[in-house]
């Protein structure tokens, strides 16, 4: 069983704690992406990054000195978005790190795919960015089916905790033999169930933590998730979609 998760824009360097285990599997293709980005002007990159002048300047300077092989941080500690804050890997025990290394895969526009203990550096790039490298018109074409092939294992079970921007990298290549389960977090707004971005990100991280702490191998066990006020709605769920509703007090 594999769990897929989106990356986060906010990243840090932490070389004082856990050391990375290895480099991301597609580091050579990452080097191609980096070279392509270095060939662009600051204004071109600002348009790609969709950011203000200050953030563009910061990332442009970082890009010029970027080293894919030194001063690396384990991916699960490098990303600092909401999902990773609620996953709280910094307080994991060894068993949880081992579980995540075997089961969690973080999808990335820059690296393609990373294991939790792969060494990464801070970068800014989203999968839907207008980036054409070689014959590829965009990053979805650039990474092709490589992400899917890295995620699928003998169990053929994938738990989708990623956003649509990233999960579509996998969904395009699914086969009838695969069991792909999307996790939906929602709450009642008026008379409708809606997904609220911040709460969904919190829940995704909390669920990764729950799965790791309970060493889950059977997807049915995920239905027991009951943190942050969420509970499983069997009446709204299916084999391909597990729906969790947050009760608002």
Model-based region annotation:
Residues 2-6, 157-160:
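Short hydrophobic beta-strand segments
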Residues 4-91:
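Active-site helix-to-loop segments that bind/position phosphate- or nucleotide-bearing substrates
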Residues 88-239, 243-249:
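Internal, well-folded beta-alpha domain core
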């Amino acid at each position: 069983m594999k769990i897929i998760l989106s990356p986060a824009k906010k990243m840090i360097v932490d070389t004082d704690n856990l050391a990375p285990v290895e480099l991301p599997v597609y580091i050579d293709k990452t080097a191609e992406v980096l070279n392509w980005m270095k060939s662009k002007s600051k204004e071109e990159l600002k348009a790609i990054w969709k950011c203000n002048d200050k953030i563009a300047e910061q990332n442009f300077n970082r890009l010029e000195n970027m080293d894919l092989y030194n001063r690396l941080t384990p991916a699960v500690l490098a990303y600092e978005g909401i999902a990773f804050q609620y996953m709280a890997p910094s307080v994991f025990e060894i068993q949880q790190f081992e579980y995540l290394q075997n089961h969690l895969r973080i999808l990335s526009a820059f690296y393609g795919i990373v294991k939790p203990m792969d060494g990464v550096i801070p970068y800014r790039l989203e999968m839907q960015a207008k980036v054409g490298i070689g014959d590829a018109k965009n990053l979805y074409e650039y990474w092709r089916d490589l992400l899917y092939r890295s995620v699928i294992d003998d169990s053929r079970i994938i738990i989708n905790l990623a956003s649509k921007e990233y999960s579509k990298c996998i969904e395009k290549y699914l086969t009838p033999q695969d069991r792909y389960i999307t996790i939906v977090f929602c709450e009642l707004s008026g008379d409708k169930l809606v997904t609220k971005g911040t709460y969904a990100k919190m829940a995704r991280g909390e669920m990764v933590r729950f799965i790791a702490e309970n060493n889950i191998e059977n997807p049915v066990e995920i239905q027991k998730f009951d943190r942050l006020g969420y509970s499983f709605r069997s009446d709204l769920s299916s084999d391909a979609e597990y729906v969790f509703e947050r009760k608002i007090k």
